[in-house]
């Protein structure tokens, strides 16, 4: 997994480009999509989790699959 701070910066850039409302709390990101429940991104020891109301997704690194899944949740 990339450095956590680098990963958070990369995700923040992506969210800014997509005009998403979000807040960073330590190693967690909360995303507030319009008319949907909060989405959380959590950085654990060896994985990155995207947690939505419906499901949790785990990734070992930030890649196209990560951003594709995130995009489907925020739009």
Predicted regions and their residues:
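Short intrinsically disordered terminal tails
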Residues: 1-2, 73-75
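Acidic, low-complexity, intrinsically disordered interaction modules
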Residues: 32-58
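Negatively charged, low-complexity tracts enriched in Asp/Glu with abundant Ser/Thr
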Residues: 1-29, 53-68
């Amino acid at each position: 997994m990339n450095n956590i701070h680098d990963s958070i910066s990369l995700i923040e850039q992506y969210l800014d480009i997509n005009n998403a409302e979000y807040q960073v709390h330590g190693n967690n990101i909360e995303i507030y999509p319009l008319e949907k429940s909060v989405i959380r991104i959590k950085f654990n020891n060896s994985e990155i989790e995207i947690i939505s109301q419906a499901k949790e997704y785990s990734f070992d690194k930030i890649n196209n699959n990560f951003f594709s899944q995130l995009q489907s949740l925020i739009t």
